[in-house]
Regions:
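Thiamine diphosphate
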Residues: 1-126
Length: 126
């Protein structure tokens, strides 16, 4: 069996997280890394680019995704510091269950290479 690691934003996981129940039902070897910045990031990026500083309907109040994974019968851990990620990943792999790693990140960090502040600055610079 092949192991799978999936990366999902918090908004994405809120829309499709119920599929984790299927992963548990079929004992799939999957680890879902939920990157939680507390918003629908792509939509917010478009808002900042077109209407800097005007936020509408993109903020999220999220559940504890790690606890949700455990409630489904899987393995779940919350990761708040980068240094804690690799040990959590190893524990998830060793658990023998479908797993969710709930990673808390800065709301400004919109992608690996960009931030909301940089997007806003580009949009407001003539």
């Amino acid at each position: 069996a092949r192991s799978v690691v999936a990366f999902a934003g918090d908004g994405c996981f809120l829309m499709n997280g119920q599929e984790f129940a299927t992963a548990v039902q079929y004992a799939l070897s999957i680890i879902v890394v939920v990157v939680d910045n507390g918003m629908y990031g792509t939509i917010r990026m478009h808002q900042e680019r077109s209407y800097p500083g005007r936020v509408s309907g993109t903020s999220l109040v999220n559940p504890d995704f790690a606890a949700l994974a455990v409630a489904f019968g899987g393995h779940g851990e919350r990761v708040a510091r980068s240094a804690d990620f690799l040990p959590a990943l190893e524990r998830a792999r060793a658990s023998g269950k479908p797993a969710t790693l709930h990673c808390i990140v800065s709301p400004d960090r919109i992608s690996v290479g960009g931030s909301l502040a940089a997007t806003r600055a580009r949009a407001t610079t003539p």
